[in-house]
Amino acid sequence: MLEEIVGQTNAVATLEHAFQEGRLTGSYLFVGPDGVGKTTTAQLFAAKLCGAASPDDAVTRRVFAGTHSDVRMVEPAGKSNTISVAQLWPRSESKDHPSERAMLRDLHFEPMAGPKRVFIIREAEGLRGGNGTSGNSILKTLEEPPAYAHFILTASSTAALLPTIVSRCQVIHFGLLPASEIETVLIARHGADPDQARFLAAYSEGRIGRAISLLRSPELLAGRDELLDLADKAMRAPQIASFKLAEEFRKLAPKLKSDVGDAGGDEKERSAREPVLNALSMLAVYFRDLTALRVMGASRAVIVNADRGEQLKKSVTVYSEEALIKAMSLIFSIRQGIERNANAQLATELLFAELAALRG
């Protein structure tokens, strides 16, 4: 079952050992970056606990479809991006979350279809909503769930969770994946061609969920082509055109927005910045290719945007080696600033002005 999970050897080994030895914990907390497989692992482990024999059998399919009677999942909802008490407990009536839809409505009933009930709480950071009321409401349950029940929480970091929740769970850590592993999975399991897989593996920054999402988004790949054309134009444009190029860059950015699972943190703010952050990531990969070509030469450089090889070879001499390295550093610095809530318009205008200045 869990062998389907890519690159999370320690996490999978811990869960498999606990299952085989019959030493299961009542409450688990899966912690790691978004898009690395926490939710997928939670669903597969839930299916295994409920009697599934393989990733393809009927039990597993029902779990992933959200129709299994003994597996329930909840995640933050509404403008506040929190998990309310009404989403958890049936005694709290709410127009938006009626009692019969509360995740824990069947907690004290024996499983109906298999040996276990499993409750998955995605983006458990949302339990801090309402001054932690929802999180506090399940502390006793997390500490001493019924023998037939297991909880699996996912989060991007323990720092964003109530300490009292973390202390009641066994923490399982998930990490970023090497690009080579993501590339292999995209080709072997999802039918990507090698050039496409190489680009997506590099751009996903270690997040297999993001890579798969991007592979399924042809409009995003088309947006990448427009972005690289804009980058090529920016490399040759006069400095006076910087503001116009920055505006084009921001207008293009929404085409590069991806839907990545396992998102955590302040999702509302993050989603507003995500398109520009994605565009900057793609721009960084492009300049990384130029730097590799400039430093190592065409015969030895491993190019991520291999399908744009001719364009790269024509553009590699526009900047000096030193300027290319400075350009990459600048892009990463601008991206980091926007992640920390810097003004995206001012930041991108500065970026394109500086890129023009580096050309000399």
Model-derived features: positions:
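Catalytic P-loop NTPase motifs of RecA-like helicase/translocase cores
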Residues: L127-G130, P145, A160-L161
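AAA+/P-loop NTPase substrate/partner-engagement loops
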Residues: A58-T82
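Conserved catalytic/switch belt of AAA+ P-loop NTPases
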Residues: S134-H150
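Flexible beta-alpha connector loops of hexameric P-loop NTPases
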Residues: K79-P90, L127-G130, V171
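Loop/turn-to-beta-strand initiation segments
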Residues: G114-V118, P146-I152
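Walker B catalytic acidic pair
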Residues: R122-E123
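Charged, glycine-rich active-site and insertion segments that engage polyanionic ligands
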Residues: M1-K48, A52-F64, A147-Y148, S156-M282, ...
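Conserved alpha-helical scaffold flanking the Walker A/P-loop in AAA+ ATPase domains
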Residues: T14-A18, A86-V118, K140
